[in-house]
Amino acid sequence: MQTVSTETVPGHETVEALGIARGNTVEARNVGRDITQSIRNITGGELKAYSELLSKARDEALSRMEADAEEMGADAVVNVRLETSKVTDGGSEVIAYGTAVRLR
């Protein structure tokens, strides 16, 4: 499955748009991790635990989007976008979406 942020897949012709493929996940922070990250927030520097959490969430959302596109019979997903939103005080949603297409 090819996924690109552009309107087309280089070297391929889009023959059919199948619809919007999407995948999302909601990840919650860990209370113990929150304490250590709060200290890091005071002293400065990267909040690695949160960076890793969001990176994992992005990967999962993209994987679920690809699975959705495969169920539609797509060869690729174009115009891929990622968005995040706060769902609760301790959790964030990451959604990946794009247009599922068939290629020639």
UniProtKB/Swiss-Prot annotation:
It comes from the Archaea. Gene3D superfamilies: Hypothetical protein apc22750. Chain B. This is UPF0145 protein NP_2600A. PANTHER family: UPF0145 PROTEIN SCO3412, UPF0145 PROTEIN YBJQ. Belongs to the UPF0145 family. Pfam families: YbjQ_1 (PF01906).
